[in-house]
Amino acid sequence: MKIGNALLAASLLMCLGQEAIADNTYILATGRRDPRMYAIDLKEALKPQNNNTPNAIVSRSKTALDRLDGKLLGDPANIVISEDGKTAYVVNHHGAIDNDEFQQHGGRGNIAVMDVRKMTQRRSDNTAEALEFHIDSGHFGAVGLVLLRDMFVIGNAESHLTEDGGNRITFVDRKTGSLRGAVELALGKPGFACPDFPVPFVSPHGPPSPVPLLSPNAAWGCFPDSNGITVGTASDGKHYLFTANGGTNDVSVIDLAAALAGSKTAEIARIPTQIGPWGIATSANGRWVVAANRESQQIAFEGNTISIIDVNLAAARSPAAEVARVLVGTSDSNVQTRPFIPSFTPDGKFIVVPNFRANNVSIVDLSMALAHQPGAEVARVPLTRPADADGVVRPARPKGSAVTADGRFAVISGGPRTTFAASGTVWIIDLRTGTVAATVTGVGNDPYGLAVVDRGD
C-alpha cells in the first residue's frame, strides 16, 4: 500500500463508515465469459477461513436460458440495481451468445431483468430461476446503462459484427421494452474522411471483408464507440448524460431533457481526455464525473489517468470542463496502467480506480485532485491472485469496482480471460486501512462490472 502521509491516512479513516457489516449484504458480480451472475455473501467472504476460496459464493444465476443443446448462453458485462434494490438489470454485452463460438464483437445487446432475492438464494445456483425476461438494447455491443424512472438509457459501443461503428445511445421503455428513441453521437475528427452519417447497418451475414473487426486499427477514430454512461446534475437542476467514448478519446455531454424530447442535437459538447475512456461514474451529489482513460482504439497505447469533469462547466460547453487529470496506478507518467471502471465512495470524497495493467487499485482524494495538489492518489493497493487450475499464478487484471453503502469496503472484480471455468477473482478492500481484507476465487471468467446490494430481509 502507498499512502501519501499519515494525515491523509487519518482523513481517509475518518471519512469512511465504521459500522458493523450488515447481514444480507451481497456482491453481485458478472461472470462475463462464464455467463452467470455470481452472488457473494460479504460477511462470509470476510471470514479468515474463507479467504482465497469460493466458499462465500451463494449462487450462480444464468443470464439467459440454455441453448437447446445445453450450452450456457449470455455475456454479462455490467449490472445496475433498481431504485428499490429488488431488481438487477444485467447488460449482456453481445446478447444470448455462446462465448466459445462468438469470438468477435458486434453482437446484439440485451438486458437481463433479474430478481435480486432469487439471485442471492442457494436454491437458485446454476439455474435461470432469477431471470425474468430480456429487453433488447436497440443496437450492438451494449455496455453502459442508466436508469430513468420510465426508461433505460443504454450505451451501445459497437456496430454489427465489428468492434467499431458505435454511435447510438438508445432509450428503451422499462415496462414494455419498446425502443423509444436514440441519440446519434457526432463522428470524431481523426484527420481523415469519415463515412456517411448516420452509420449504415452492414449485412446480417457479416461485414464486408475490408471492415476491420478488432482494435487497435489505424483506420478507426470516426465512431465514438461509447462504453460507460452516467448522469450528472448541474447546479440549476438540469440533468446531462456523459458517455465514455473509447473510439474518439473524449466524453460526450448530452442534454437529457432535449434527448427525451426527441431532439437530434441533444449532444451539446465533447470533452477531450488523455486517451479512450471506458468506465465513467458520477459523485452522489451529481456535480462531478470521473472517466477512466483506458486505451486507444487506433494504436497500441494504454492510458494511465482519470479525468475529473465539472458538470456545471460541461453544461456551459466550456473547453475547461475537465478540471483535473490524475495519474493513477503508477508514479511514472510513462508507465501505462489501463484504468478501467471507477467508483465514488458514497460521500463523494474518494474515487476508487482499478488499474488493469498495473494490477493495483488507486484511491484518489477528490478535493486534492480538484486543488491540483500533489499526491491526490492517496493510496495504491496491490492485487494478487492464487494459482489457477494449471498451477500458474497469473496477473490480477482488475476491471470492475463498487463501494459498499457505508463506504467501508471497495469490491473489485478481475482476473484474465482463461480456458478454465470460474477462474475470476473478487477482492474486498478495507478502505480504512487501504489493504485487501478478503479474496474470493472462482468468480466467473474475465468478470467485468459488479454491484453491492443489501437484500433487506
Regions found by a protein language model. Give the residues of each.
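Bacterial N-terminal signal peptides
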Residues: 9-15
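Predominantly soluble domains enriched in secretory-pathway, periplasmic, or organellar proteins
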Residues: 19-457
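Bacterial N-terminal signal peptides that target proteins for export
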Residues: 1-7
